[in-house]
């Protein structure tokens, strides 16, 4: 089989640009999500946007619009249930996301439409259109900029919320900002890895970075780098193997984590300390 320059194809160019934009945003967020123990929240939002996607399709709206609405609804509902203190926080999250995900599957099964369920669940980067790519960039770029600008405040929030209040900042405002950013990141990752695997982009890069360094300032460039490299490998692999792009990205992330974990285990006393000394 002769070598083919995959960059000569417009659909591959769109896939790579969309994938990189998504990886950078999710990679940044992953640092705080994993440190604050918000992995389940990310999983909840990613599953809860399914009915929004179906409803948006029925109304002739972009998928991202419906997904964003239900992502924000999920954040609000989980917050209200947690405030009631009647049920445990993890229970509240589980109830909300399973209910919405079930609603989405019912809508897909009962409402006549041309929705490709596999594309929603596992993503379809190779089928991204120019408007889709521009939507991801327009949403992702402001999020990335704001996260970088607020990284010190968010890092302080993740380590010591009491200190945040002591210096006059609002923990509620910062938490709300992070939740909205999380919702938006999951919405744009719908194009890349779909509903089910979007959580992998939000958890694995940060977990890998945490194995390599204990300092957040290093994690904030290592995590997006790992996410970006994994997306590039996943997209390339999906093209040559004719496999699911979302599945290949998720698999690549898993392999990268395993490699770093094994190396960390074998070189426990030296691996990762080089960065932390600088």
Stretch-by-stretch model annotation:
Residues 2-14, 85, 89-153, 180:
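Transmembrane helix-bundle core of multi-pass membrane transporters
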Residues 15-18, 63-71, 90-94, 137, ...:
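Loop-to-transmembrane alpha-helix initiation sites
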Residues 1-24, 273, 277:
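Membrane-interfacial amphipathic/re-entrant helices at transmembrane-helix boundaries
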Residues 196-247:
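Transmembrane alpha-helical segments in multi-pass inner-membrane proteins
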Residues 2-10, 24-35, 52-62, 153-163, ...:
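Short juxtamembrane and helix-loop transition motifs at transmembrane-helix boundaries
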Residues 31-113, 209-221, 238-241, 264-266:
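Short loop segments and helix-boundary regions at transmembrane helix junctions
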Residues 246-250, 254-278:
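Cytosolic-side transmembrane-helix boundaries in multi-pass membrane proteins
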Residues 133-205:
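Helix-loop-helix "hairpin" substructures at the membrane interface of multi-pass membrane proteins
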